[in-house]
């Protein structure tokens, strides 16, 4: 399978974006895919979520400025077939620095070329910053599709409408003519509440088959796992959160195979 690049993105924080990037990456690796997690969020929560410490100079920052090769920034994790390009605080300056450069929206795409050409990974998941700044737009420009986590709350659909506008602009300007939403996953679902069920129904009515069947539940174990530097499948495999992300990985795999 040629390398597929998927950006995990939502400009609203606290919707399960990084949780989804980390756990989907781990669950795809667990079904024998070679996965690279590219952490572009300066908060570096995906980096610590797979057990790596924040290390000065470890991020993709200098590569995005045109210095070096992204392959040299890839670090192994304790989890088989899962590798990571870490993030750290220097990425905070990326939006300002990239804005001054030529082809400033294509820097991540250019950085990923040697990764794609190497054939080393079947899937690259990008954990985007919780914003629609230049770094996130770079991730969009480099991606084959977007995976959008939506929290089961009242304002869930606001995020997707803004995302659609940005997608349209990137397609129309030729930055990424084929970019589309790969899938939408509902997160923090609480089946006991009327609101959660109503929001899921509303999103499914609006977005149809783009919405994954799997919903990610609210889960204490899911919330605990990052503090131990482990994806949920390696922290508590028999939890509801692990079961949900394993099912999501199967759905993602089906879509990837169909898209070939």
Regions picked out by a protein language model, each given a short descriptive name:
Residues 1-260:
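P-loop NTP-binding core
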